[in-house]
């Protein structure tokens, strides 16, 4: 296949993926490698939006959040995603990729607010859009934000980048007999109790008939192979 399989995609990155082998924070070499993968896909003409988590930063302050009100802790997590989004966008700009960070909570001196028509305009102009601050509401994960934004922008697929190269029948780190699914339906994943995304995000994707591709961001070239429609990771579909 010489042309990409998708025109517009939503890439979900976990904050933990930015840590590399560090205990928390942002590993510079890791983020530069991710940006190289992202820029390669962008240059193929694929319209790319990104939702990133905040676990790598929140992990460093988590002990101090014990006993904290859940909503307050969630807002702290949203701010962590803004920091990650700024770091990612800055790294992209340094390699000549135009990126725009749009936040679900107002921090107008730092990033612009999320406005759907503006996000669509940026994508059509070939810019990468990084959605920060989750959904802007506590009690919702960044997985749910990825499903929501993916549906809003009309993405053809949600690409969930993890440290594991797909969905397995069991934990491959614990069960040597665990097998990777190449494709699986939403209903099969539910019946087999496979953890693909949190329940809210998973239900939203299923209801909107928005497929999910789970793949390893650690594998070199995996993102490009996914976008080109090659057999990489696990496709979850209706």
Curated annotation (Swiss-Prot):
Protein name: Uridylate kinase
Positions with a binding annotation for ATP: 12-15, 55, 59, 162, 168, 171
Function according to Swiss-Prot or TrEMBL: Catalyzes the reversible phosphorylation of UMP to UDP.
Compartments where found: Cytoplasm
Gene of this entry: pyrH
Residues bound to UMP: 54, 74, 135-142
E.C. code: 2.7.4.22
Main location: cytoplasm
A GO cellular-component term linked to this record: cytosol
Gene3D superfamilies: Acetylglutamate kinase-like
Assembly description: Homohexamer.
Regulation: Inhibited by UTP.
Keywords: ATP-binding, Cytoplasm, Kinase, Nucleotide-binding, Pyrimidine biosynthesis, Transferase
Position of the signal peptide: none
Record's keyword annotation contains Kinase: yes
GO MF annotation terms: ATP binding; UMP kinase activity
The organism of origin for this protein: Herminiimonas arsenicoxydans
Keyword Kinase: yes
Pathway(s) it belongs to: Pyrimidine metabolism; CTP biosynthesis via de novo pathway; UDP from UMP (UMPK route): step 1/1
Protein family according to the UniProt entry: Belongs to the UMP kinase family.
Any GO BP annotation: UDP biosynthetic process
One Pfam match: AA_kinase
Top EC class of this enzyme: transferase
């Amino acid at each position: 296949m010489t042309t990409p399989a998708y025109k517009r995609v939503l890439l979900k990155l976990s904050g933990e993926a930015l840590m590399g082998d560090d205990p928390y924070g942002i590993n510079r070499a890791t983020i530069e490698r991710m940006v190289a993968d992202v820029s390669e896909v962008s240059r193929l003409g694929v319209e790319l939006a990104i939702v990133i988590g905040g676990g790598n930063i929140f992990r460093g302050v988590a002990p101090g959040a014990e006993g904290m009100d859940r909503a307050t802790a969630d807002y702290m997590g949203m701010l962590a995603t803004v920091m990650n989004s700024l770091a990612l966008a800055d790294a992209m700009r340094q390699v000549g990729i135009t990126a725009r960070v749009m936040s679900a909570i107002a921090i107008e001196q730092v990033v612009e607010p999320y406005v759907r028509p503006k996000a669509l305009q940026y994508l059509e102009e070939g810019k990468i859009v990084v959605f920060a601050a989750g959904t802007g509401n506590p009690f919702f994960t960044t997985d749910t934000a990825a499903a929501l934004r993916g549906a809003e922008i009309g993405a053809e697929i949600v690409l969930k980048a993890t440290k594991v190269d797909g969905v397995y029948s069991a934990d491959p780190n614990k069960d040597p007999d665990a097998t990777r699914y190449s494709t699986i339906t939403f209903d099969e994943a539910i019946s087999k109790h496979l953890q693909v995304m949190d329940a809210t995000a998973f239900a939203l994707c299923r209801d909107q008939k928005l497929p999910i591709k789970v793949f390893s961001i650690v594998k070199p070239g995996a993102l490009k192979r996914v976008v080109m429609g090659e057999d990489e990771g696990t496709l979850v579909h209706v």
